[in-house]
Amino acid sequence: MSVEVYRQKIEKGGYSAAYEATRRYEREEIEVLSWSSRWESAWSKFGEAVKALGKIEGAPRALVIAKVQEALAYMSKPLPNMKLAMAAAVQAVRACEQLPGMNRERCLDAVAGALGVAKDWIRREMTGGGGGGGGGGGGGGGAVV
């Protein structure tokens, strides 16, 4: 936090405002650090899940990995978007189910383990029990020329 910001805080609200601004900044720093460690933890779990799927080749495996990465990205932001993360997780499970020798439970275990979430969260999204779901999207507009 810059000296100029402190000076403005003191002029506007006294030393208590400057102190509060400092505390808020420190809290944000701690939050960023905790997100950083969560991200590293999520990636290590993802690595374990990829090893579990490592014997399987082909496009569905690549899609599973891509969707798990997408879900991790949504979850690891400072303001996570769990709706989009769970949608990506559902797509990962559905792609995983296409792999030889995999069934829904094994896929749920792998994806939920990689994301560090309860597999019931993903299962609930798959069955449509995730808060009512939105209606279908409208038709796309024509190209603007």
UniProtKB/Swiss-Prot annotation:
UniProtKB keywords: Disulfide bond, DNA-binding, Virion
Assigned GO CC terms: helical viral capsid
Superkingdom assignment: Viruses
Protein's UniProt keywords contain Transcription: no
Major location (coarse): virion
GO molecular function terms attached to this record: DNA binding
Disulfide bond positions: C96-C107
Localization of this protein: Virion
UniProt KW Transcription regulation keyword: no
Subunit and partners: Heterodimer composed of major capsid protein 1 and major capsid protein 2.
Chain's role: Self-assembles to form a helical, filamentous nucleocapsid. Together with capsid protein 2, wraps arounds the DNA and maintains it in an A-form. Capsid proteins probably maintain the DNA in A-form by non-specific desolvation and specific coordination of the DNA phosphate groups by positively charged residues. This certainly protects the viral DNA under conditions such as the extreme desiccation of its host.
Name of the featured protein: Major capsid protein 2
Lineage: Viruses, Adnaviria, Zilligvirae, Taleaviricota, Tokiviricetes
